[in-house]
Each structure stands twice: as C-alpha cells, then as structure tokens.
Amino acid sequence: WRDGTYEASESSFSHGYKNYVRIVVENGYIVDAHFDAIPEEGEKMKYLASVLGDYGMTANSDAQAEWYVQADRAAAKLLEMQDPAKILGSGGEVDAISGVSVTIAPHFQLAQKALSGKRR
C-alpha cells in the first residue's frame, strides 16, 4: 500500500448512523485502522459513545461485548490480514471474526473503498 491516511464513510445514514473508517499506512503496511460510525444527530461518534457507556450495547441486548470492543477486534483483523479483500467474501460478507457479533461487513467494504487505487 502507498503510505498515507485514508478515510471513507457511507453516503447515507441507517439507524441514526453512517459507518466510517480511517486507515493509516506506513512503509507499505496497514499500521492502524479505526472503525466508527458518524451520528445523524448528536455529537458523539458511535465508538466514543460506546466507550463512555452511552451506547449500552451489552446492557440492552445479548451482545457479548460493547460496540467499541468489537470494532477494535475487527480492526485488528484488518491489521493482521493487511487487505480487506482477504476478509470480505465474494458477496461482500465477512466470515466470523472471534469476539465480533455486530454487522461489520460495511466497515470492511469501506476499508476497501478507502484503499482503492492505493496499491504500490
């Protein structure tokens, strides 16, 4: 990958948020990935709201971990694999990632969009 910081977000909101990714590439490698969601109303991004306990995923559902924890696990998978295409299936789906039960495929699709045309 070409060095740089790359971002992408969905064009429209769904359930009050639109997904967003930021990817940092250094020396040709993905060294940081941040999966988040921009709120339609309010100030807090979904990641921050989750960290602060305002998103309440485990309190309000049978989720195994808060949203930010699952987002970090998914982002770690991208750092491990170094290519969103290696994680996304041919139909745009994501196989199970240990400890992630939220729908995460849109973030990997956005990662692919952010990195489009950035190969060395």
Predicted features and spans:
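Active-site- and interface-proximal helix/loop "cap" or "latch" segments in soluble metabolic
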Residues: 1, 9-120
